[in-house]
Amino acid sequence: MQNAGSLVVLGSINADHILNLQSFPTPGETVTGNHYQVAFGGKGANQAVAAGRSGANIAFIACTGDDSIGESVRQQLATDNIDITPVSVIKGESTGVALIFVNGEGENVIGIHAGANAALSPALVEAQRERIANASALLMQLESPLESVMAAAKIAHQNKTIVALNPAPARELPDELLALVDIITPNETEAEKLTGIRVENDEDAAKAAQVLHEKGIRTVLITLGSRGVWASVNGEGQRVPGFRVQAVDTIAAGDTFNGALITALLEEKPLPEAIRFAHAAAAIAVTRKGAQPSVPWREEIDAFLDRQR
């Protein structure tokens, strides 16, 4: 593993409260669950953990509450090779929470309270201007306030820091933001939201990628689930297949892919090789339960790839 440029991740931190039960309660009904766990999540934190465990030189800009969960999350992130200096503790606020019910068929219903995530303001981003300006890449998602994502993208763009955006959860985005993005990684749903093109095959993916190229984005990677990734650089596209594994839990597959992908690109791996590295990380993650507990370490990814040769 060669020395690589530095990465800044900006995003969300949640505590996931997960209750498994046979069937969802109807209004007014109380249902007994069969398994409960608290796991750390949030798209930003998941991607930061994936990058840290993949070997990136990474700092994380985020917010937690001044509660015990926030303290536990910060301690855990520090053990994942992440510089948590830019993680702000918001007085009087709770750490972000996701309440997740999972039924016997594996379906889920989720309610989220942003908590301290909503306090990740443009002012807090501005306080990290030098860190963003000096980084090789900035990786963001859409669980943070959009004005803060925009502020960080502007700083990065002005200083030739690569801007990578995972546009999740799916939403429409202003062209002003998209014009600042160098690498975008939507799934099919997110690509349709951004382009108006339903992505059902490689031809659709190529059309959607072209729309995003026309908005100023050089590298478009549309994730296609088990079919892999449609990778398009300035209109030159190809599908890079993933690995076949027996999936147990796909909760953090996309986040693992994104964190590992940017790590590999910062090591100057060619794009197809970086995607293959990210596919390997995600393939390992889906064979394990939970969000961050499923994210593999670099040694595991390298060993997985060695077995595929």
Curated annotation (Swiss-Prot):
Requires a divalent cation, most likely magnesium in vivo, as an electrophilic catalyst to aid phosphoryl group transfer. It is the chelate of the metal and the nucleotide that is the actual substrate. Also active with manganase. Substrate binds at residues 14-16, 42-46, 143, 255. Coiled coil: none annotated. One of its GO terms (biological process) is D-ribose catabolic process. Its EC number is 2.7.1.15. Activated by a monovalent cation that binds near, but not in, the active site. The most likely occupant of the site in vivo is potassium. Also activated by ammonium ion. Ion binding induces a conformational change that may alter substrate affinity. Its cofactor is Mg(2+); Mn(2+). Signal peptide: none annotated. Keywords: ATP-binding, Carbohydrate metabolism, Cytoplasm, Kinase, Magnesium, Metal-binding, Nucleotide-binding, Potassium, Transferase. It comes from the Bacteria. One of its GO terms (molecular function) is protein homodimerization activity. The active site is at residue 255. InterPro entries: Carboh/pur_kinase_PfkB_CS, PfkB_dom, Ribo/fructo_kinase, Ribokinase, Ribokinase-like. Optimum temperature is 30-50 degrees Celsius. Optimum pH is 8-9. Homodimer. Belongs to the carbohydrate kinase PfkB family. Ribokinase subfamily. This is Ribokinase.
